[in-house]
């Protein structure tokens, strides 16, 4: 009887371990699939970069409402548009908009604000987004993470990392960041009441 109870206890522990491993594998698969879709979305945006640039006819920011309606036809099949908002398969909200450089209006940038609601996998997902961004270093101006616990709180911006062209002087280069760097930038994502946002700025 005692031996049987011991066997059952071992089976129970192994079952719990198996469930935990399965859950981790499913989370990793979901994150990989979602970042692949996001990369697909970025590729399409950059493909139409000249058209997007023409939308910016003055010094005003082109809001996401105008862009969202223009690009709906190439959204990944698991994404959806709801008014001016885009949502991916994990219900993360994506805000694309175009604006001038604050110091030189001749330069225009496509910004994508990728908002992750509060969740336990945000740090892991944020790290995956940094990895996804690296192949775009030649066309990226900068990448950064920001958090904001409440509407009344000041936005907390993590260290920006820079694309190849803009990585000068003492700036941190996107291609040079390590896993430890990414963890440091992303750690706050799991601690904020309102989640965090991953921002990419592309040169147009």
Task: Show which residues each predicted segment covers.
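N-terminal single-pass transmembrane signal-anchor helix
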Residues: 1-26, 34
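Glycine-centered flexibility motif
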Residues: 6, 53, 72, 87-92
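Alpha-helical protein-protein interaction elements
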Residues: 14, 65-66, 71, 154, ...
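Membrane-proximal N-terminal amphipathic helix
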Residues: 20-56
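Short, glycine/small-hydrophobic-rich surface segments
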Residues: 45-83
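Intrinsically disordered, low-complexity regions enriched in Pro/Ser/Thr/Gly and acidic residues
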Residues: 79-204
């Amino acid at each position: 009887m005692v031996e049987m109870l011991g066997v059952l206890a071992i089976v129970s522990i192994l079952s719990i371990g198996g469930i935990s491993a399965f859950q981790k594998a499913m989370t990793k698969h979901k994150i990989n699939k979602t970042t692949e879709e996001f990369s697909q979305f970025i590729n399409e945006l950059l493909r139409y970069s000249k058209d997007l640039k023409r939308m910016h006819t003055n010094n005003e920011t082109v809001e996401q409402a105008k862009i969202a309606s223009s690009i709906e036809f190439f959204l990944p099949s698991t994404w959806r548009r709801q008014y001016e908002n885009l949502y991916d398969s994990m219900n993360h909200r994506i805000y694309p908009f175009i604006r001038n450089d604050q110091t030189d209006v001749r330069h225009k940038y496509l910004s994508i604000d990728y908002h992750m609601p509060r969740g336990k996998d945000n740090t892991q997902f944020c790290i995956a987004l940094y990895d996804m961004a690296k192949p775009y270093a030649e066309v990226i101006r900068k990448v950064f993470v920001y958090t904001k616990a409440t509407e009344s709180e000041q936005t907390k911006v993590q260290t920006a990392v820079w694309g190849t062209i803009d990585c000068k002087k003492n700036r941190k280069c996107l291609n040079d960041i390590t896993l430890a760097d990414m963890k440091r930038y992303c750690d706050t994502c799991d601690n904020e009441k309102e989640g965090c946002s991953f921002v990419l700025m592309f040169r147009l």
